[in-house]
């Protein structure tokens, strides 16, 4: 739903940033481990500070670092979810939701990694798209990430750089 809202709405980038930060904020409370809570809170605080710097009235932007912190936070959530998923042998609705959550976190991580690849190299995806190097590109990155996770791809968008191709094979 978010990519559709981002493409149609004039406030899609703001909504994307609010939702991404709220996911990372809610993840702080998804474990009972004190050290995981601390690491998650630190990563969230750094991510929030970097976003405020970028959207504030100053000339500085740490776009790549923001996404690297987002990837680190996503990896932490994957670790937390996998620990919860395999803690016992009981199959329940919570276990199924947890498995879907892991899958969606992999898609989010893939999209964030594509943003880093594009920001660092200037080339990531090709096809019938125009990438601007801004948050608006998330629509294409999450689409490619989800399609690569669920199928072998539709062929309308494809990886063109070596790092993006390696990521596509990982997904």
Go through the PLM ranges and name each one.
Residues 7-8, 109-143:
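Outer-pore turret/helix-boundary of cation channels
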Residues 19-30, 46-50, 69-79:
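Alpha-helical transmembrane segments and their membrane-interface exit regions
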Residues 2-4, 45-53, 108:
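Aromatic-anchored segments of alpha-helical transmembrane domains
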């Amino acid at each position: 739903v978010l990519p559709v809202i981002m493409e149609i709405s004039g406030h899609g980038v703001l909504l994307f940033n609010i939702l991404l930060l709220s996911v990372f904020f809610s993840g702080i409370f998804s474990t009972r481990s004190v050290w995981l809570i601390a690491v998650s809170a630190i990563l969230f605080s750094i991510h929030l500070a970097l976003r405020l710097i970028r959207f504030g009235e100053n000339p500085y932007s740490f776009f790549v670092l923001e996404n690297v912190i987002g990837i680190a936070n996503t990896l932490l959530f994957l670790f937390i979810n996998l620990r919860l998923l395999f803690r016992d042998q009981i199959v329940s609705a919570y276990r199924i939701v947890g498995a879907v959550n892991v899958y969606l976190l992999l898609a989010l991580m893939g999209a964030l990694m594509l943003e880093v690849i594009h920001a660092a190299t200037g080339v990531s995806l090709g096809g019938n798209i125009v990438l601007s190097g801004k948050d608006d590109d998330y629509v294409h990155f999450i689409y490619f990430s989800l399609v690569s996770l669920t199928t072998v791809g539709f062929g309308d968008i494809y990886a063109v750089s070596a790092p993006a191709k390696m990521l596509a094979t990982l997904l």
